[in-house]
Amino acid sequence: MAGPSWGLPRLDGFILTERLGSGTYATVYKAYAKKDTREVVAIKCVAKKSLNKASVENLLTEIEILKGIRHPHIVQLKDFQWDNDNIYLIMEFCAGGDLSRFIHTRRILPEKVARVFMQQLASALQFLHERNISHLDLKPQNILLSSLEKPHLKLADFGFAQHMSPWDEKHVLRGSPLYMAPEMVCRRQYDARVDLWSVGVILYEALFGQPPFASRSFSELEEKIRSNRVIELPLRPQLSLDCRDLLQRLLERDPARRISFKDFFAHPWVDLEHMPSGESLAQARALVVEAVKKDQEGDAAAALSLYCKALDFFVPALHYEVDAQRKEAIKAKVGQYVSRAEELKAIVSSSNQALLRQGTTVQELLREMARDKPRLLAALEVASAALAKEEEAGKEQDALDLYQHSLGELLVLLAAEAPGRRRELLHTEVQNLMARAEYLKEQIKIRESHWEAESLDKEGLSESVRSSCTLQ
């Protein structure tokens, strides 16, 4: 099948051209298939004489796992061969090198770039998690990039991977110390959650330029691993609250308090729901159908919300689409929906102002009639504070919290209020505040729609989309 030669190994059907890298027991080469396609592949060449029992087990595990899975963000094992001297794993070639080199040549990655990579890594890990597979050696060196131009992440090197249910525990030390979860070193007892710690270390390194336990010596590294100190995040560069929240929850030393796989995959910063895929366009169109229906029914607020949710899927649909003509058609549709969203925004804003005026009048009358009710006056003061907070830019969540606190009190008071004019006004006030709270919830949903602003800028739609889905 193959035989040794000077310099590069020989393998039937392939021409090996250059060494890409080497590890503990394997060397990886770039190669071309001799077929007409001249397909470029990476060949992992493992010298049999270098294998001990543990490395044979690792190699067999890697082959077993990789031959049974296909995922756009996991390196594909195309075939494997062997001869008297070597075992050859013929794999998908990734021209962009590894994530470690990508990070260090740029020193740090912008949050928006790190987020795209994290979304892709999360997608691969979700696929593995559904099959009870744990990687156990996640690190930037084991994450490859499809190319340097618009790179896609590819998870590689499954030599330490294991079939593990979430409740399985292992006691064998595996992985690289800088990226290894503390429980692997301190307790020699661990489960699948160690992969989540490693994800946190990778994200930390991408954003801050080095892993949290970067050390000058192994003894210093061991001290940091065994310490009980909380992992502190640098203040610079400035990161979004969602990003910092995810990092802190991933880098929780106690696995029982670490973010779960379910919560990781559902985390708003990861946002797997809006990852570019073949389904993005269909999801966007389905939401547009609902938006048009609500629009025709005269429910402007619901229609606006649905149009904005649809646009959240049109963005990844544009990313996913490679055909220039179809891409232009999508952009044209997006332009139409943005225009309608602008019109709906004006309608909703007008209704909002009318609701505010009505609420102020009722509250003034009710305040006059509540001079002998300190608890009622206090609840109305909280409602007034909510109205004031709502006028401040970006304070919707604070205003909503105040509205909910006020409503909690007012509903109790309403139930105990005797029939009469004050009860009627109190009932009206509760209805107004509930409407305000519901409106704010919708506002927050819209604001939390994760527009990839930089992507939209490339499409020339950023400002119009953002302004259309932001109510004043």
UniProtKB/Swiss-Prot annotation:
Catalyzed chemical reaction(s): L-seryl-[protein] + ATP = O-phospho-L-seryl-[protein] + ADP + H(+); L-threonyl-[protein] + ATP = O-phospho-L-threonyl-[protein] + ADP + H(+)
Subcellular location: Cytoplasm
Active site: D137 (proton acceptor)
SUPFAM superfamilies: MIT domain (SSF116846), Protein kinase-like (PK-like) (SSF56112)
InterPro entries from the UniProt entry: Atg1-like, Kinase-like_dom_sf, MIT_dom, MIT_dom_sf, Prot_kinase_dom, Protein_kinase_ATP_BS, Ser/Thr_kinase_AS
Pfam family, one: MIT
GO BP, sorted A to Z: autophagy; fibroblast activation; negative regulation of smoothened signaling pathway; positive regulation of smoothened signaling pathway; protein autophosphorylation; regulation of autophagy; smoothened signaling pathway
Annotated positions binding ATP: L20, G21, S22, G23, T24, Y25, A26, T27, V28, K44
Residues modified as Phosphoserine: S176, S350, S384, S464
EC number(s) stated in the UniProt entry for this protein: 2.7.11.1
GO molecular function, one term: ATP binding
Modification(s) after translation: Autophosphorylated. Autophosphorylation is blocked by interaction with SUFU.
GO cellular component: cytoplasm
Broad class of the protein's primary localization: cytoplasm
Leader sequence residues: none
Start and end residues of each Protein kinase domain: 14-270
Annotated MIT domain residues: 280-348, 375-444
Alphabetical UniProt keywords: ATP-binding, Autophagy, Cytoplasm, Kinase, Nucleotide-binding, Phosphoprotein, Repeat, Serine/threonine-protein kinase, Transferase
Enzyme class: transferase
SUBUNIT field: Interacts (via protein kinase domain) with SUFU.
PANTHER family assigned: SERINE/THREONINE-PROTEIN KINASE UNC-51-RELATED (PTHR24348), SERINE_THREONINE-PROTEIN KINASE ULK3 (PTHR24348:SF65)
Main function: Serine/threonine protein kinase that acts as a regulator of Sonic hedgehog (SHH) signaling and autophagy. Acts as a negative regulator of SHH signaling in the absence of SHH ligand: interacts with SUFU, thereby inactivating the protein kinase activity and preventing phosphorylation of GLI proteins (GLI1, GLI2 and/or GLI3). Positively regulates SHH signaling in the presence of SHH: dissociates from SUFU, autophosphorylates and mediates phosphorylation of GLI2, activating it and promoting its nuclear translocation.
Family, per entry: Belongs to the protein kinase superfamily. Ser/Thr protein kinase family. APG1/unc-51/ULK1 subfamily.
Protein name (Swiss-Prot/TrEMBL): Serine/threonine-protein kinase ULK3
Gene: Ulk3
